Swiss-Prot record:
It is an enzyme of class 2 (transferase). ATP binds at residues 7-15. One of its GO terms (biological process) is pyrimidine nucleotide metabolic process. This is Cytidylate kinase. InterPro entries: Cytidylate_kin, Cytidylate_kinase_dom, P-loop_NTPase. The keyword Transcription regulation does not apply. SUPFAM superfamilies: P-loop containing nucleoside triphosphate hydrolases. The lineage of its organism: Bacteria, Pseudomonadati, Chlamydiota, Chlamydiia, Chlamydiales. It is found in: Cytoplasm. GO terms for molecular function: ATP binding; CMP kinase activity; dCMP kinase activity. It comes from Chlamydia trachomatis serovar A (strain ATCC VR-571B / DSM 19440 / HAR-13). It catalyses: CMP + ATP = CDP + ADP; dCMP + ATP = dCDP + ADP. GO terms for cellular component: cytoplasm. Keywords: ATP-binding, Cytoplasm, Kinase, Nucleotide-binding, Transferase.
Amino acid sequence: MIITIDGPSGTGKSTLAKALAQTLQFLYCNTGAMYRTLAYARLQPDWQEVPLEDFLASPPFSFSFSKDSPLQAFYGDHLLTSELSSQEVANFASLFSKEPLVRAYMQTLQKQYATVGNCVFEGRDMGSKVFPHAEVKIFLTAKPEIRAERRLKDLPQGSLSKEALMAELIARDQADQQRECDPLVIPQDATVIDSSDLTISQILEKILPLIPSHLT
């Protein structure tokens, strides 16, 4: 079974997806982290001038995904963690993900991972493009000021003001919604949830009734 959770940054997708996967004992795949991994690798000096086709054909990054562990991203042999949370990487990932070659490459990987077992996929086009026939589709929204507060917690203290981050989030939304390749949209048949004033437990209470009873 595939469950998709889509929505813009700061709506709580990652926290919800992890909690839902843990509750159901499903696998969890953070596709945003996959795009940020590509962006991080592409920003490294040795790879900035390499043609995109060659970069993807012999990538300096890799992913580990199995029934026993969540998605892990590597640059060479180095496990990427906090590097993927920087605003520079996030901003470049937004630009880089517009490339049709990049999206096709990533979607192929994501579909391969879906064969491993029951999975919760989190991203921006999971229910609309990658898994349009997913059994359960969720689309999260939240007020811009709430999203900015959440994202600030992931950034080094003092790196950005709430107002500046809110402006970046709104600009990112517009870019994601207006891009020609797989824009951010509410998937057909998705359940839309505003997470602004809800805890993760409250959101789970809304979602779990959508899951077949034998899986909950």
